[in-house]
Design a protein with these regions (language model features):
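Glycine-biased, small-residue-rich flexible motifs in mid-sequence functional cores and linkers
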Residues: 1-159
Length: 159
């Protein structure tokens, strides 16, 4: 679904708590956040980590497991960077399974979720977290950051 500017503004007015940047400490790490912070309190959290080298049938199996567990009440946690992770995020949002997304390049002061996440944020099924300051230029240590975010996702899931 495409949301035009007027609809975006209306959704932000209806749910200001989900569209306000805040500073928080999550698993002992200072982070910026936008979205539904209460998702951190859901007891069952599932980390998703898909190598770029997985075959589509392997991604599909992980996706099915995530969707089943999500429908049973789990929150899915991941940076959602790899194509497989992105497929899982998209499938989860289509059936209103909550996501905690760890962003690799921080959040600018005027941050607004991209189209694919906007409606999920308005519906309270999305939390975006980042331990990094905003960076618009190319990230030099991408692999290290990805590993850090996967480690943070694991820590969030262990609670």
């Amino acid at each position: 679904m495409t949301i035009d500017h007027t609809q975006r503004q209306l959704l932000k007015q209806q749910h200001p708590e989900y569209f306000t940047l805040s500073d928080n400490t999550v698993v002992g790490i200072p982070m910026q956040a936008m979205g539904n912070l209460s998702l951190l309190n859901i007891p069952t959290k599932l980390q998703v980590q898909c190598s770029r080298h997985l075959y589509q049938n392997e991604i599909d199996a992980i996706k099915e497991d995530c969707l089943q567990r999500g429908k049973a009440g789990a929150v899915i946690v991941s940076p959602f960077i790899s194509p497989g992770e992105q497929q899982i995020a998209t499938a989860a949002m289509h059936v209103n399974i909550p996501l905690i997304v760890l962003r690799i390049n921080g959040l600018p002061p005027d941050f607004e979720p991209e189209t694919r996440y906007f409606e999920a944020c308005a519906n309270g099924i999305l939390l975006i977290l980042t331990p990094f300051p905003y960076q618009s230029e190319r990230i030099e240590n991408m692999r290290q950051r990805c590993l850090q975010l996967n480690d943070i996702a694991a820590r969030i899931c262990k609670g």
